Amino acid sequence: MPVDRDIVLEKVRSHLAEELGVDAGGITDDTHFRDDLEADSLDLYELVMELEDTYGVKMSEQEAEQIVTVGQAVDFVAPRAEVSA
């Protein structure tokens, strides 16, 4: 069962704010991981691992490389997410 998109967005924003030391309120769908947040490949790998662990989503390396904005990450995860009771 898909997870509400807003829930995934909040998780991504929270993770990025904590890991990168940025204001979560400034993170939008259009926020670019590298250009706007200056995230490096390790930061992005950690985000992918967090999303996989939290939502049971598997993302290939090729899929991860295609995701460059917060909105793209959320749109990938939300419909594929597994909800645990």
Each model region followed by its residue ranges:
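Thiotemplate assembly-line natural product biosynthesis machinery
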Residues: M1-A24, P79-A85
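Helix N-cap/coil-helix junction residues
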Residues: G21-V22, A39, V57
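Glycine-rich loop motifs involved in handling phospho/adenylate chemistry
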Residues: T28-D40, S60-G71
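Phosphopantetheinylated carrier protein domains
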Residues: L44-I67
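C-terminal structural segments of small proteins and small subunits
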Residues: E65-S84
